[in-house]
């Protein structure tokens, strides 16, 4: 992150004989402390969002004048430099507020277009309690999964390549359901996403996860593991508030392991924030 901010010769517009001289010209040193209260392998895009947060803080402190699009682009570069791979969807999801449809064009340089969608399905009293997030206590990091999927794409794997236009059309269907405030359609499309995830990666739904889903699937319109799958959090769309109560009771009484628990989720209306004290 500091390299991308110019604290390395390859990324600096000015030349310095040493880092000490550069910091002297800058006027101070920099100490960075990180805290992420989310477990590794959560599937919530935490590594990308944390990287964006660090870049956003450095941007503010150093007066680099990056906007949110710049921060998201530099996050992609940072993750490539760290060899973690990944795309841009996680940081755009976290840095920008609310519900969004993200669209990009083909090409090496990606400049996603952000279109905001209404939040009615997530905040209206009829639907708010139907969105459930459950930590499974099972972890699986995304790096190796991403490498396998990208490799399959480059090797022209037919099953993988045929999924791409389906996933694009599915995103547009989901956007339309949200625009129309069609809760039933939204929930079932979440379930379709889960089916597509499993077709993309056979390790998405291991037996331990399948056992959790089996207990609650009859009370849901749809469910999926966010991110690469295989562990982390389980997002569920209950059929109605009463069904949501049943899901909470079942998974609380029959927790698969001591780490498993429900966590409260709300929609961010601010996105990335940087404050000074």
Enumerate the predicted regions with their spans.
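C-terminal nucleotide
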Residues: 2-25, 35, 62-64, 68, ...
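Conserved glycine-rich beta-strand-loop-beta hairpin in the small C-terminal domain of fold type I
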Residues: 232
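Glycine/charged-rich beta-loop-alpha catalytic/anionic-binding loops adjacent to active sites
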Residues: 28-40
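Short glycine/threonine-rich catalytic loop with a Thr-x-Gly-x-Asp
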Residues: 44-46, 223-228
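DPxDG-like acidic metal-binding loop motif
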Residues: 43-64
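A generic structural signal for short coil/turn motifs at secondary-structure boundaries
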Residues: 40-44, 199
């Amino acid at each position: 992150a500091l390299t991308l901010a110019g604290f390395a010769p390859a990324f600096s517009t000015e030349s310095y004989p040493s880092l000490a001289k550069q910091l002297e010209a800058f006027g101070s040193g920099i100490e960075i402390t990180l805290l992420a209260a989310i477990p590794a392998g959560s599937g919530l895009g935490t590594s990308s969002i944390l990287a964006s947060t660090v870049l956003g803080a450095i941007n503010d402190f150093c007066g680099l004048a990056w906007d949110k699009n710049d921060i998201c682009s530099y996050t992609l570069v940072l993750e490539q430099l760290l060899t973690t791979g990944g795309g841009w969807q996680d940081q755009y999801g976290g840095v920008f507020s609310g519900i969004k449809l993200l669209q990009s064009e083909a090409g090496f340089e990606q400049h996603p277009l952000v279109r905001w969608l209404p939040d009615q399905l997530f905040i209206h009293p009829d639907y708010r309690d139907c969105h459930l997030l459950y930590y499974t206590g099972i972890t699986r990091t995304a790096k190796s999964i991403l490498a396998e999927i990208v490799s399959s794409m480059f090797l022209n794997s037919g099953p993988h390549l045929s999924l791409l236009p389906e996933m694009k059309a599915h995103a547009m269907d989901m956007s339309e359901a949200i625009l129309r405030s069609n809760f039933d359609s939204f929930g079932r499309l979440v379930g379709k996403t889960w089916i597509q995830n499993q077709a993309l990666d056979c390790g998405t739904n291991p037996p331990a996860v399948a056992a959790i889903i089996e207990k609650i699937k009859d009370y849901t319109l749809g469910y999926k593991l966010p991110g690469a799958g295989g562990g982390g959090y389980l997002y569920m769309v209950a059929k109605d508030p009463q069904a949501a109560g049943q899901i909470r009771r079942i998974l609380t009484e029959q927790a698969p392991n001591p780490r498993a628990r429900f966590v409260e989720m709300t929609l961010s209306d601010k996105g990335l924030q940087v404050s000074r004290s």
